[in-house]
Amino acid sequence: MSAQSPTVATACASIRFAELEELLHQVFVRHGTSAQVAAILAHNCASAERDGAHSHGIFRIPGYLSTLASGWVNGTAVPSVTDVASGFLRVDAGNGFAQPALAAARPLLVEKARSAGIALLAIHNSHHFAALWPDVEPFAEEGLVALSVVNSMTCVVPHGADRPLFGTNPIAFAA
């Protein structure tokens, strides 16, 4: 008797980027984020989905909602941007998501990069930075070079190693 391979039929549907972004926005707001935080998270997740990185698209929504429901993350946090030096900003994300912290700092960071030739941003007191490329691409669109690094749980074992050393998304570059 031969093994039978079950066929799984899956329905596929297409949705326009703006519609997905709006749907995700509504989901985030209904689960306790401010409208501003929801817009930023929705854009990030929709961008990841559009770009084929499903692991950082709508796949992430249950995790986001779980952290909101448990109080692990503050969905209404208002990031506080501190101008530290001519080429340095620091953002306290207020125990919120990291993406809104970056969004709050981006205009001044771009200004500093143009005037000082280089700028550094440090975000602290934040949760889950998600996929990095949607957050560095706007700097490239401004004609700048951007490098983003993030610490995360170690789960990637480098070639030749015997234990995890890197997170799954430690570096992004845009030009």
PLM segments and residue spans:
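Structural signal for hydrophobic packing residues in well-ordered secondary-structure cores
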Residues: 24, 28-32, 49-53, 65-72, ...
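Metal- and O2-centered redox machinery and metal/ROS homeostasis
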Residues: 6, 10, 75, 100-103, ...
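Active-site cofactor/substrate anionic-group-binding motifs, chiefly glycine-
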Residues: 56-110
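Glycine-rich anion/phosphate-binding loop at the beta-strand->alpha-helix junction
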Residues: 118-175
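General structural feature for long, well-ordered alpha-helical segments within catalytic domains
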Residues: 16-24, 37-44, 57-60, 64, ...
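Generic N-terminal amphipathic, Lys/Arg-enriched alpha-helix
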Residues: 2-31
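Alpha/propeptide regions of enzymes that mature by internal proteolysis
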Residues: 29-30, 39, 43-46, 99-102, ...
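N-terminal glycine-rich anion-binding loops that anchor highly charged ligand groups
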Residues: 12-20, 33-59, 73-84
